[in-house]
Amino acid sequence: AAKNDLKAYVMNYNNPGSGNTPKIPMSDADYNSLYQSVQLQFFPGEKMIYLTTAFSNTYNYFTSAQAKRLILLVSLESNRLQLAKLSYRSITDRNNFNILYDMFTSQASKNDLEAYVKAYKD
């Protein structure tokens, strides 16, 4: 399977519009660099800008665990909810996305995210 994944990736690398490009999560080195950059931001608004940009970039993909760890750098629950929704597009292991739900103390936030995920269309 890994060989086929690699072959598909290589074949689609120069043809991103094909729709078959595999979603490969960000490398550990790139992820750690991003995490440290966000962590160094003092103001919450700056963290939101960094994370919004990272999750909006169509070339960035994350595992659920990577996304959760990044989102936990933001303390306000409404911002976490916004980022969790934004990150869903870029998640490579959506079957594990449920690990993000425990970031929320409010059941309303959990319900809101669940409704978003159920209605999401690629």
Give the residues covered by each predicted segment.
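General marker for long, soluble alpha-helical cores
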Residues: 1-122
